[in-house]
């Protein structure tokens, strides 16, 4: 996917949202095109079409042969008839307001990319991704987290878990190009499937999934240069990363709109039963059951994810690594987690 914009310094949220569909390349409208630009499934323009120079620059960019048959979604900052006509004149396949809510934007992109219709799992995934995007954007900007949107994401993830098709969920998660979104969606999907496997009633399932959705909210305040670094973090960068549990806890506590267990999961999902975790070195019964579940899902997710500095573990090896952690994790819950990721006889 290619995002063409005249305000690249303000495009981070949109880029992250578009990365749901795979790699999103961002192009500054007024800079020469890079020689390695690849064919794209969709072009998205976020440009002020009230400026003649911008219109001509977009027209010139879209005239390149490789883009002539590529769908073009034009985001308008002003929905006036004149600019809508201008967007159509430069070949827009669809025109939407630039401030459209994330869910509506992703729905429209889905219709463009999948004109034959979506499978239910895709709809659940898009709804969850849109909520995740709004949540992380609000956290990064220091705004109140969108409670209703987060609740909608939790519902979407739980409905996806009802289908007992974790493999399809994982396949869609892997298409997301942003590592933080990918990890949050992966942990949330695993946690929802875990609660479903344990036969939890609906309210308990919502609590577990909500805790997983929010567990890494503190990472929204970690500099992107550290989060997106190609390679292992330095000691100093690791120290910054290790602040995210306390940051997330304080953020959720301050807003006062989330379950106590979810707030605790944000702070304690890196704690271990033997006291070797962080940030507080909790032991045993000091770590609630919901947090123990999220921790298992978080570790498993990290093991099967691909990063620039490591290859992903296959499911069997990742589960074996959980077992090998012994007294750090709840052994009963680790055993109960097995059917979630390794269906079939033990």
Predicted regions located by residue number:
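Non-catalytic interface/linker regions that flank or bridge core catalytic/transmembrane domains
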Residues: 1-173
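Short gly/ser/thr-rich secondary-structure transition/capping motifs
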Residues: 25-27, 192, 276-278
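Phosphate/oxyanion-binding loops and surfaces in catalytic or ligand/nucleic-acid-binding neighborhoods
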Residues: 112-115, 340, 344
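Acidic/His-rich, divalent-metal-binding segments that scaffold phosphate/diphosphate chemistry
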Residues: 114-239, 250-253, 261
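Alpha-helical scaffolding flanking metal-ion-dependent phosphate/phosphodiester catalytic sites
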Residues: 187, 207-222, 233-335, 343-346
